[in-house]
């Protein structure tokens, strides 16, 4: 089902392995057409169905644009680029070499994700001739409208939040959005940088935004949202810091968070293998940041 957010912004539920409300894919339709996020390689057929449901052909796609290149966001980038011969992919400069030569990217993903990486599937390389490197502030004209790159590291060093007028495609820079709970929780992998994550949230907060478009999952009204996001990140880091100082395990710390945040434990089981232990992984990412600070 295609959701029409506005005259130019559309989105659909990718449903990887049948999991609903896990990955949103967005499309901007102007004189040029931009596809924002592709999902993993294993969901390429679902992505093609979504594009077809939009009434578009693969030749209509001009730009394929990830917020960052984690497998659940852009593992299928090379697969769809092989089919969209008129398209160019727009990526962070730090992602450029990884998407043109995927072996390091793939091996790093397998090391971090284990079996989930295999479920997502191996990415395919994209020729450098079809890549655009987007520095901070880079603007891409789509005709009557444009997208601007706001570098938002923290979750990943190669993360971009794409600004579209008073809307932002936030990827994972503002956590995971659970509309049923009206809250976003952090998602902080092993190389998480808490200082940069908070700076990125502040950069987004300085803009007069009306909507945040989450990959996980769906649009969120921006009013008050980033204040909630920053407060939640700070609460989690405070809880993790207390646990770190007491030499608690990551499992013990996540249980404290489950007790402190209504609905949090249930979200850990809401998307099968895709979501399992996500919050434990976030605690471990925060612990790793604290350890690096102390090193």
Predicted regions and their residues:
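Conserved beta-strand hairpin/beta-sheet module of binuclear metal-dependent hydrolase folds
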Residues: 1-54, 162-172
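Divalent metal-coordination and catalytic microenvironments
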Residues: 8, 28, 37, 47, ...
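Metallo-beta-lactamase
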Residues: 40-42, 60-72, 99-151, 157-223
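Metal-dependent catalytic neighborhoods of phosphoester/phosphodiester hydrolases
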Residues: 74-84, 101-102, 223
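Internal alpha/beta domain cores that form substrate/cofactor-binding pockets in large enzymes
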Residues: 191-199, 203-204, 212, 220-251, ...
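C-terminal regulatory/interaction regions
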Residues: 242-295
């Amino acid at each position: 089902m295609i959701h029409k957010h506005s005259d130019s912004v559309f989105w659909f539920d990718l449903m990887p392995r049948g999991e609903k409300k896990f990955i949103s894919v967005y499309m901007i339709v102007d004189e040029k057409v931009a596809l924002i996020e592709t999902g993993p390689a294993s969901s390429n057929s679902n992505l093609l169905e979504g594009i077809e449901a939009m009434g578009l052909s693969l030749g209509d796609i001009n730009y394929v644009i990830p917020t960052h290149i984690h497998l659940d966001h852009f593992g299928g980038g090379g697969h769809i680029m092989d089919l969209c011969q008129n398209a160019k992919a727009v990526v962070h400069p730090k992602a450029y070499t990884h998407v043109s030569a995927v072996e390091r990217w793939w091996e790093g993903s397998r090391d971090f994700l284990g079996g989930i990486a295999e479920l997502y599937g191996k990415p395919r390389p994209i020729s450098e001739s079809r890549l655009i490197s987007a520095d901070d502030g880079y603007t891409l004209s789509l005709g009557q409208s444009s997208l601007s790159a706001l570098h938002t590291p923290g979750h990943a060093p190669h993360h971009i939040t794409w600004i579209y007028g008073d809307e932002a495609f936030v990827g994972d820079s503002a956590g995971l959005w659970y509309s049923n709970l009206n809250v976003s929780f952090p998602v902080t992998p092993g190389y998480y940088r808490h200082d940069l994550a908070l700076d990125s949230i502040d950069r987004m907060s300085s803009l007069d935004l009306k909507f945040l478009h989450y990959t996980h999952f769906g649009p969120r009204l921006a009013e008050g949202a980033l204040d909630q996001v920053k407060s939640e990140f700070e609460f989690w880091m405070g809880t993790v810091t207390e646990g770190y100082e007491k030499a608690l395990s990551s499992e013990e710390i996540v249980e404290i968070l489950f007790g402190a945040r209504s609905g949090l434990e249930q979200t850990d089981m809401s998307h099968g293998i895709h979501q399992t232990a996500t919050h434990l992984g976030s605690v471990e990412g925060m612990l790793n940041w604290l350890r690096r600070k102390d090193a």
